[in-house]
Amino acid sequence: MELNTLKPAKNSVKQNTRYGRGQGSGKGGTSTRGHKGAKSRSGYKSKPGFEGGQLPLQRRLPMYGFKNPNRVSYKPINLDTIQQLAEKAQLTVINPEVLHQHGLVSKRDKCKILGNGLLKTKLEVTAHAFSASASAAIEKLGGKANILNIYA
């Protein structure tokens, strides 16, 4: 046996049915597309949500809610991430500029500190928002949780 003589096992490779290759093949003529109509033509593509002229589901249901153009979205940062950063860079003050320098947030991100994880060191943390558990954990160790104005 050599690489140039390898073949798949007998009956392990099934041939695909070739449509539109003459009447003798059993799949010639209309090539399983039926007679006439848009679906029998080449280039036909159904539109998403089209239900054959019946009023589509997305138009039958009423409109609901809206997207608030003045919404404020925050980048969540947990206490365990802040603890790792403080240990790695020997920091006592954490603010959005420091988080940006270490690649945790982009320059325009508004950050919210969340209380997931343990904080072991006393830190002065400045952010746009804090969860109740995060600010409690920071102040429990004698640190400070300073809130920035989100519109500044």
Curated annotation (Swiss-Prot):
Feature: compositional bias, Gly residues: 21-31
Residues spanning the membrane: none
Gene Ontology MF terms in the entry: rRNA binding; structural constituent of ribosome
One Gene Ontology term from the biological process aspect of the record: translation
Region (Disordered): 1-56
GO cellular component: cytosolic large ribosomal subunit
Subunit structure: Part of the 50S ribosomal subunit.
Protein name: Large ribosomal subunit protein uL15
Organism classification: Bacteria, Pseudomonadati, Bacteroidota, Cytophagia, Cytophagales
Gene encoding the protein: rplO
